[in-house]
Design a protein with these regions (language model features):
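Helix-rich C-terminal "collar"/helical-bundle subdomain used as an assembly and partner-interaction module
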Residues: 58-174
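Long, charge-dense, solvent-exposed interaction surfaces that engage phosphate-rich ligands
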Residues: 1-49, 53
Length: 174
């Protein structure tokens, strides 16, 4: 019964689910929990978790999540769009900080729609990021997007490079 509830009514999602199951290593033991994880068609939380980890410098955790998306052949364009959106939101936050607002005032600003559970992450991001670093990362992201579209078979290699670039922007102090 639990498996039935997890399946979507959308036939494309069901087809994707069967593809994910067939891509699993044949020698690997498949238990019920692993099967539930594979057929769970709601990857949104994991994507946001991956991007948040990346944006606060947890490269290894974010890259492991990225590998999971590569295994299920998740759209690189969707990942890039969400990273770009996070950078744009962070730009707004930094501009507000430069206009004299405190971190608390920024994360509680209704126009930004920052979820309460993300407040501590944004506090960290505001410590790590500057407008110039974001601009440099957005430029690299746009180049990555072009590469992913023109050389689709290498899209996850380009995403890996982008993740490394973002990580080094956070960790290397000018």
């Amino acid at each position: 019964h639990e498996l039935t509830n997890k399946f979507s009514k959308d036939s494309r999602i069901i087809q994707n689910t069967f593809e994910k199951i067939s891509l699993q290593n044949k020698n690997e033991h498949m238990n019920f929990d692993k099967l539930l994880h594979l057929i769970d068609d709601n990857n949104d939380d994991t994507i946001f978790e991956m991007i948040n980890k990346l944006m606060i410098g947890n490269y290894y955790e974010s890259i492991n999540l990225l590998k999971n998306f590569e295994r299920i052949n998740f759209s690189s364009s969707s990942i890039l769009y969400l990273i770009k959106s996070k950078f744009k939101l962070l730009q707004k936050c930094i501009n507000m900080r430069e206009n004299g607002l405190t971190k608390n005032e920024i994360v509680n600003n209704k126009s930004l729609n920052i979820f309460y559970k993300e407040h501590s992450l944004f506090f960290k991001m505001l410590d790590f990021w500057t407008l110039s670093k974001i601009d440099e990362c957005l430029y690299f992201l746009f180049k990555t997007e072009l590469n992913c579209k023109s050389k689709k078979e290498y899209d996850y290699i380009f995403l890996n490079q982008l993740f490394l670039y973002i990580y080094f922007k956070i960790k290397i102090k000018p």
